[in-house]
């Protein structure tokens, strides 16, 4: 009896010591031992943090499960933190690790030498392959022209936006990665885009994300329960994506000409050959596959989703859509697709794209960062292993920086003469050391695709259709628009 009581007391003391809140953290919620304070499922996490901001201020601690999270709710804090080396890692989240089969590979979720090596390599190769240059613009314009022809088959009837939009965006990434494209009617291409969408969506599941914040659950949860929570579905999707990558890698290995690399995959395979005797090299087939998957995941779903958001807002604000079309008509001759050369003459259109980015905040809490050592921020101490979350929506709706923070107002990005102006406080591609490697490509795609679409079509809501622009509380990472119906009308 006494022994049992002593063991219980010892357990209580151990839990207390392990659960003790580190000194110097920002104010906020600590919660219970082992479980912290879990967020509500009925409200988006970003909205729950906004409520906490009213009580605790712009820098907030919230222990979710056993993870110490620090949320940053203004631009200066976000810029300062994400520029620090100490805050440049990604957390070892379970959902992140599933993409690398438990390994620290790729470029989006990796850290240290792995991340630095592949980020530099990708930026150099994409620059050489034409990111931001006319060579790549021609490929995007070809996809835009094909998309215009495809959309003509879907006019004058209520329907969801065609999936061919996703495939057109995907083809741009395929061109860069493997010098490949699908017809917009191709069943395999459409299946691949749907697989990307489904896998990204599955990654956001609330139940599955419990393992990110309660890692001890992995040790006690039976496999059948894990599968019910979404592990098998996500893992199967990742494996299927990897199988696609394997096929193209094998084809490129068979046709590789080291003197004439035609795409990113060739460049990787050549570099892999050159470093095969280097024991410190991070280049191997598994890593190449992971990096290519990162490019598809980050470069396809985000851009196609922003096209869908933009069309939704232009349906909701038809006067903005009409003004853009008048601007395009005045700058671009009919029968000629808009190009980057017309950018200076399409200031209102450019401003509208940026305003959709601002009002939507596609990744409301940014992609999680992680402290790789103890550091200080705004007078507070962030211990090693702290998850750092950037509340980009707070940055994008801060009345200190935006004239009409809660309204859709393209004039946020226009000066007094009606010319487009960049705003430093728009951080939709993040900021600091891990700013998105594909920012230039994404901006080019959005400009070319949307200008071509709006030059040729008008989008309106069917009678009685309610257009929802609020976030889905079940989505932990991205903010996808709710499904909507649209009527596409060809312009004369």
UniProtKB/Swiss-Prot annotation:
Name recorded for this polypeptide: Cytochrome P450 2L1
Binding positions (heme): 436
Compartments, as annotated in UniProt: Endoplasmic reticulum membrane; Microsome membrane
Enzyme class, first EC level, given as a word: oxidoreductase
Family that this chain belongs to: Belongs to the cytochrome P450 family.
Organism in which the protein naturally occurs: Panulirus argus
Gene that encodes the chain: CYP2L1
Known EC number: 1.14.14.1
Keyword Iron: yes
GO biological process: one example: organic acid metabolic process
Principal cellular location given in the protein's record: endoplasmic reticulum
Membrane topology label: Peripheral membrane protein
Coiled coil: none
GO terms, molecular function: heme binding; iron ion binding; oxidoreductase activity, acting on paired donors, with incorporation or reduction of molecular oxygen, reduced flavin or flavoprotein as one donor, and incorporation of one atom of oxygen; steroid hydroxylase activity
This protein's GO CC annotations: endoplasmic reticulum membrane
Function: Efficient in catalyzing the monooxygenation of benzphetamine, aminopyrine, benzo(a)pyrene, progesterone, and testosterone.
Domain of life: Eukaryota
Cofactor(s) this protein cannot do without: heme
Catalytic activities: an organic molecule + reduced [NADPH--hemoprotein reductase] + O2 = an alcohol + oxidized [NADPH--hemoprotein reductase] + H2O + H(+)
Sorted UniProt keywords: Endoplasmic reticulum, Heme, Iron, Membrane, Metal-binding, Microsome, Monooxygenase, Oxidoreductase
């Amino acid at each position: 009896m006494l022994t049992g009581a002593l063991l219980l007391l010892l357990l209580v003391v151990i839990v207390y010591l392990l659960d003790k809140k580190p000194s110097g953290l920002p104010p906020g919620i600590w919660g219970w031992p082992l479980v912290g304070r879990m967020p509500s499922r009925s409200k988006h996490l970003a909205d729950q943090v906004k409520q906490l901001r009213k009580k605790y201020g712009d820098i907030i601690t919230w222990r979710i499960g056993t993870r110490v999270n620090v949320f940053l709710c203004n631009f200066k804090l976000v810029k300062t933190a994400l520029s620090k080396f100490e805050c440049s890692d990604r957390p070892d989240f379970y959902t992140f690790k599933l993409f690398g089969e438990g390994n620290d590979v790729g470029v989006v979720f990796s850290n240290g030498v792995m991340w630095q090596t592949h980020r530099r390599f990708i930026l150099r190769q994409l620059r050489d392959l034409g990111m931001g240059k006319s060579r790549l613009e021609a490929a995007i314009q070809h996809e835009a022209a094909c998309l215009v022809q495809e959309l003509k088959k879907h006019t004058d009837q209520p329907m969801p936006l065609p999936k061919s939009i996703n495939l057109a965006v995907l083809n741009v990434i395929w061109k860069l990665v493997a010098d490949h494209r699908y017809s917009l009617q191709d069943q395999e291409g459409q299946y691949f885009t749907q697989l990307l969408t489904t896998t990204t969506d599955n990654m956001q599941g609330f139940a599955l994300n419990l393992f990110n914040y309660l890692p001890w659950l992995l040790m006690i949860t039976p496999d059948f329960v894990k599968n019910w929570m979404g592990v098998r579905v996500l893992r199967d999707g990742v494996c299927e994506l990897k199988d696609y990558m394997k096929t193209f890698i094998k084809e490129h290995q068979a046709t590789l000409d080291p003197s004439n690399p035609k795409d990113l995959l060739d460049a990787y395979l050549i570099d892999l050959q050159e470093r095969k005797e280097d024991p410190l090299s991070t280049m191997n087939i598994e890593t190449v596959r992971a990096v290519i998957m990162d490019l598809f995941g980050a470069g396809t779903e985000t851009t196609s989703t922003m096209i869908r958001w933009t069309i939704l807002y232009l349906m909701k604000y038809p006067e903005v859509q009409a003004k853009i079309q008048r601007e395009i008509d005045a700058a671009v001759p009919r029968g000629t697709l808009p190009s980057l050369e017309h950018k200076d003459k399409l200031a209102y259109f450019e401003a509208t794209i940026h305003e959709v980015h601002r009002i939507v905040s596609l990744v409301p809490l940014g992609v999680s960062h992680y402290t790789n050592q103890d550091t200080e921020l705004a007078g507070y101490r962030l211990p090693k292993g702290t998850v750092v979350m950037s509340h980009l929506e707070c940055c994008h709706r801060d009345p200190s920086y935006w004239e009409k923070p809660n309204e859709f107002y393209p004039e946020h990005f226009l000066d007094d003469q009606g010319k487009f102006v960049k705003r430093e406080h728009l951080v939709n591609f993040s900021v600091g050391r891990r700013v998105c490697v594909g920012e230039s490509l994404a901006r080019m795609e959005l400009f070319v695709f949307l200008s071509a679409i709006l030059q040729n079509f008008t989008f309106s809501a069917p009678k009685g259709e309610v257009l929802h622009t609020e976030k889905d509380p079940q989505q932990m990472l991205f903010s996808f628009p709710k499904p909507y119906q649209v009527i596409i009308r060809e312009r004369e």
